[in-house]
Amino acid sequence: MTTERMKITVVGLGAVGGLIAAKLALAGHEVSALARGANLKAVQEQGLRLRMDGTEQTATIAASDDAHALGTQELMVIALKGQALPDITPTLAPLIGPDTLVLPAMNGVPWWFLRTPALSQRLAPEQQQLTSVDPSGAIDQALPLQQVLGLSLIHI
């Protein structure tokens, strides 16, 4: 993995995901997005527009509703509402390789919360799945915990 120019995909192009994707693309990274609906169509047709401090910039990024089209990434930023994650997680496999880092940019209690070293040492394995967040275990199965950048704060 390089620290100069990374291959990054942002999952979800709402306000948070769009801002992160635009900033990373404008900084020179190879950015793509997994999106849907009106946001996907707008980015495909017009690029990703960022209005800040009285100026507007347009970032050109690849955007698709199909993870296969985007391929394996160095970094995957998940910028979704927490309740959307269980449904989309099974579709993310094409984005994740053995060296892909996963950065959750989400609010709420993360699915991996009970697996942190401080808690996992005190809980039996069957107590470590946060069923209120990941009822079926699909998120835990799809996103390798050792590749998740946990306890993340994103400063923009």
Model-inferred region functions:
Residues 57, 65-154:
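Rossmann-like NAD(P)(H) cofactor-binding subdomain of soluble oxidoreductases
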Residues 1-2, 155-156:
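Short, intrinsically disordered or compositionally biased N-terminal tails of bacterial proteins
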Residues 10, 40, 45-47, 58-61, ...:
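Generic secondary-structure boundary/loop-capping signal
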Residues 17, 55-56, 62:
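Short leucine-rich amphipathic alpha-helices used at interfaces
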Residues 2-52:
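NAD(P)+-binding Rossmann beta1-loop-alpha1 motif at the extreme N-terminus of oxidoreductases
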Residues 5, 28-30, 60, 99, ...:
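A generic structural signal for alpha->beta connector loops
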